[in-house]
Design a protein with these regions (language model features):
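Long recognition/docking surfaces used for binding and targeting
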Residues: 2-70
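Conserved short hydrophobic patches within well-ordered secondary structure
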Residues: 24, 28, 69-71, 80, ...
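Short hydrophobic/aromatic-rich motifs at helix boundaries and adjacent loops
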Residues: 57-62, 103-105, 186-189
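Conserved S-adenosyl-L-methionine
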Residues: 73-171, 181-182, 202
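Conserved Class I SAM-dependent methyltransferase catalytic core
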Residues: 128, 176-235
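Short, intrinsically disordered, charge-balanced linker/junction segments flanking boundaries
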Residues: 163, 233-238
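Switch/connector loops and helix/strand junctions flanking conserved nucleotide-binding motifs
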Residues: 167-170, 207-209, 237-238
Length: 238
């Protein structure tokens, strides 16, 4: 049971999402949600973020690579985690009320809805629009605006939940690192000894024993794998 109830029957057409996002953000920024009868639960269910809203057309680009790179620049790998997946993963982990819990790229705070103690939640997010929504929905949480690469946690964590930005290249040309791998490294710095990392990543992450050998060895040094499983192919379908 979360702080807000998920509307399982709600379906928002893609063409309406951007307009709804903008209206919600305006009401939150201007403290007018109550004036128009909009509840936090309404916002929890309706605000969807940037994923899929790039507005680009494949035919305007010379090749598919240029198209996907332009999409990345706009979306920054952002696709909010579906509420049912967050609820399921939190139920699997069963965090205790005293646990210090992080999400290092929290979006609008989808995992937070199902955590036991709002004031024990910490994290950072680079999208200011999402930050404003998350801070509105979870006012007792310790939520910062900023880049994960510059984030300095104030406490060691018991659990890190995460759905890192997909397929972004961070680091340098000489030492590139995927956004997913960077998230793992940052989580390792944040967690206490014996802490738990609960992560959503593409199936391609660390899937090649040859080309990913170094990263696989580093992950094996930092973490002990407890369990992994695949989500349905349409789990992030808009």
């Amino acid at each position: 049971m979360g702080k807000y109830k998920r509307d399982k029957g709600l379906q928002i057409p893609m063409e309406q999402r951007q307009n709804l996002n903008a209206k919600i953000l305006y009401l939150v920024e201007n403290h007018e949600t109550e004036l128009y009868g909009i509840t936090p639960e309404d916002i929890f269910n309706v605000y969807m973020g940037n994923g899929g809203l790039h507005g680009l057309d494949r035919k305007d680009f010379q090749n598919f690579h240029a198209y996907t790179e332009a999409k990345k620049e706009i979306e920054q790998g952002q696709f909010f985690t579906p509420a049912e997946i967050c609820e399921f993963l939190v139920a699997c982990v069963k965090p205790e009320p005293k646990d210090i819990i992080y999400d290092l790229t929290y979006g609008k705070g989808d995992f937070f809805n199902y955590l036991p103690t709002e004031s024990n939640i910490y994290g950072t997010e680079i999208d200011m629009k999402a930050v404003k929504i998350a801070q509105y929905l979870y006012p007792k949480a310790n939520l910062q605006y900023g880049d994960i690469r510059q984030y300095s946690p104030v406490l060691s964590g018991d659990i890190v939940f995460g759905n890192p930005p997909f397929h972004l290249e961070w680091g340098t040309k000489e030492a590139p690192v995927s956004s997913q791998m960077y998230y793992c490294k940052k989580a390792y710095q944040v967690l206490k000894n014996g802490g738990l990392l609960v992560l959503l990543v593409p199936e391609s992450f660390l899937s090649d024993d040859f080309s990913n050998k170094g990263d696989i060895e580093e992950i094996s040094h930092m973490f002990n794998l407890i369990v992994q499983f695949s989500l349905p192919a349409d789990a992030f379908k808009e």
